[in-house]
Structure formats: structure tokens, C-alpha cells
Amino acid sequence: MSRELQDVDLAEVKPLVEKGETITGLLQEFDVQEQDIETLHGSIHVTLCGTPKGNRPVILTYHDIGMNHKTCYNPLFNSEDMQEITQHFAVCHVDAPGQQDGAASFPTGYMYPSMDQLAEMLPGVLQQFGLKSIIGMGTGAGAYILTRFALNNPEMVEGLVLINVNPCAEGWMDWAASKISGWTQALPDMVVSHLFGKEEMQNNVEVVHAYRHHVMNDMNPGNLQLFINAYNGRRDLEIERPMPGAHTVTLQCPALLVVGDSSPAVDAVVECNSKLDPTKTTLLKMADCGGLPQISQPAKLAEAFKYFVQGMGYMPSASMTRLMRSRTASGSSVTSLEGARSRSHTSEGTRSRSHTSEGTRLDIIPNSGGPGSSAGPNSTEVSC
């Protein structure tokens, strides 16, 4: 893409988890169930917030390495903008084995599930709670797991929000580098370098320090290392952008790919975008944002998520957000991410802009998603 994306004026920086914050405090108006569920590949810790509503999907989250569902998603689900969404959907938070708060160490010789096996554990979670389908939200390793789950069980997944997703296996040079890093770096430093770019580590010292402290003091180091090893041993997802007359494997559901413009995962997310169906995929690049948009800019991510589920046909009567009201007042025809997706066949020079009173802008930029794809429809890239 030749056109440079613009930064926004508004930047939010919040701690990973406020002091004393708990998941029950987050969603105190909803029932909260915590269970350890036995699956094909062992036990998994799950927290269900709210009551599933008929045939409506639940929002199922999966966290990245070095995190659990609280540190990965509390700032997002605690934001005011997310409350309207959680009134319409129950939320099911999944913690990878041994990553939940207070997790005991695995016994010597324990074989940690592979990434494929972690995905194969999720049908058992849905069965336990009587759930028919989900809207998945995954970050990093969790995004990979949910993508694998959707490829294996397309009938169970209505949509995916994938933050910092990497569809590729770790190359042998990356593998060697991670091995050497494991010999020379402390575990917290390895995880921090996975989540934060160099610029972010220099400019957001307080957030990075808080996260390093969390890894050192709140995570079980042995369990965390096993999860990291599983992620580093992942297979390529082997997905391809569908072409007329060709039999290809890719996601069947709508997907919203999210990445901060200074995230270390930018290249991987763009690569994933090039492998998905452009008529069902939107790439959201968040300006002035690093590796954890759900933590640094939860309000903007909640707004994008709201447009995403509205595009799927849910929450049609939901109140308009500040950005939506600004678009309406200015006469913009762009009303949702799904609406933008349906208009992605315009020329490369087309750009729709909306300005809010706070200075936040969302740009819709038709994007081919990669070289060699000009013969087919374009996916939509959004910058906010």
C-alpha cells in the first residue's frame, strides 16, 4: 500500500489491571461462572460472564502468551463503550492451561498441548455450557488458536476479531533466535519483546514496566514457558486467498484483523490479511498504538467491535457512538465496517474521512491485501 496512514490525536494509556480489579468487579451486574473443564487434551479454565441468550453467539476470548484473560481483556471489557455490547452477549473467557491466576505447576513430564490441540479443546467448552456458536476475540497466540478452531469448526464460529494474528509457523531462523534468547534473556524480557515494539518500549516505559512486573510476580514461570514453547512450535495455518475455480482453505466467517501501527506484529497481520477472503475481511490499523490495542485504546477497539457485530446483523438498534454521530452529521455514507467492506471495489485513490470533536479519524482505504491479488475484489483497510 503506497498511501501512508495518518496518526490520530487521541492516545489512551491505561494499566493492564487496575489495583484491586477482578473479573467479578468488571461485570458485576452479570452472573459469573468459573469452571475447570475437562477436554480431549486436559483441563482448561473458563470464566463465563452473563447468561447465553437463545441462539445468539457468545463472545469467546483467548489471550496471548504472558497473559491470562484478566490482564489481556479487563481494560477492554471494563470500558464504558463495551458495556452496551456485553448487555447483548454473554462473554466466555478461556485461559490456556496453567495461565490462570493462582495456577499450580504442572507435574514433571507433563506434555503441554500443542497449538492444534489447544484449538481442539474448545468444542468441549462450548458443549459444557450448551453453546452453539461464538464470536471469537483472540490476541497473538489466542488469535492463532481461534483461527485454527474456526478452520476446523466453521459452523461454530460466526465471526472473528483477531489482534496481532500470525498465520505462519516460526521460521528456522526465528526458532534459532528464540532458542538463543532463551539462553540469554530472562522470561519477562522475552515476553515483553513479543508484545511491544522498540518505539513503544521507549515511549511507554510505565506500561512496559507494569507488564514486566506482572510476568515476574503473577505468572507461573514454568507453565508460561510451556505455553511459549507451544506457540513457537505452531504450524503454518495453510490458508490462501480464495480464487475463482480454485479449491482453497480460508476462513468462512467475517473477520476483523486489528493491529497497532507500531506493533511488532504489523507484517504478520498484513500477511494474514492477504490470505483471507477480501469480501469478508477488514484490516484495522490503529494509529498511535502499539502491541496491545485492547489495553492502550479500549474505547476505539470497542467501537470497531460494535460496528463489526452490527455488520453481522446483531444490535441493529444500538445507540450511535461519537464517531457514528459525527459521520451522520457530516453526511458520510460510511456507516459501519461492514458497510465499508461492501464498497471495497472502488479505486485505490478513494478515501473516506470522518472527524470527531476529539480529533479521532477513521479512514477507509481500499486495500488489495497483497501483490498478485488485483484480479479479485479488494479487502478494506481501516485506519483510526
UniProtKB/Swiss-Prot annotation:
Residues 327-336 have a biased composition (Polar residues). Keywords: Acetylation, Cell membrane, Cytoplasm, Cytoskeleton, Membrane, Microtubule, Nucleus, Phosphoprotein, Repeat. The modification Phosphoserine is found at S2, S319, S326, S330, S332, S333, S336, S342, S352. Residues 374-384 have a biased composition (Low complexity). Residues 325-384 are annotated as: Disordered. It is found in: Cytoplasm, Cytosol; Cytoplasm, Cytoskeleton, Microtubule organizing center, Centrosome; Nucleus; Cell membrane. Its main location: cytoplasm. The modification Phosphothreonine is found at T328, T335, T346, T356. The modification N-acetylserine is found at S2. Sequence repeats lie at residues 339-348, 349-358. GO terms for cellular component: centrosome; cytoplasm; cytosol; microtubule; nucleus; plasma membrane. Residues 339-358 are annotated as: 2 X 10 AA tandem repeats of G-[PST]-R-S-R-S-H-T-S-E. Under stress conditions, phosphorylated in the C-terminal on many serine and threonine residues. Phosphorylated in vitro by PKA. Phosphorylation enhanced by increased intracellular cAMP levels. Homocysteine induces dephosphorylation. Phosphorylation by SGK1 is cell cycle dependent. One of its GO terms (biological process) is signal transduction. Residues 345-361 have a biased composition (Basic and acidic residues). Belongs to the NDRG family. Stress-responsive protein involved in hormone responses, cell growth, and differentiation. Acts as a tumor suppressor in many cell types. Necessary but not sufficient for p53/TP53-mediated caspase activation and apoptosis. Has a role in cell trafficking notably of the Schwann cell and is necessary for the maintenance and development of the peripheral nerve myelin sheath. Required for vesicular recycling of CDH1 and TF. May also function in lipid trafficking. Protects cells from spindle disruption damage. Functions in p53/TP53-dependent mitotic spindle checkpoint. Interacts with RAB4A (membrane-bound form); the interaction involves NDRG1 in vesicular recycling of CDH1. Interacts with APOA1, APOA2, PRA1 and RTN1. This is Protein NDRG1. The gene is NDRG1.
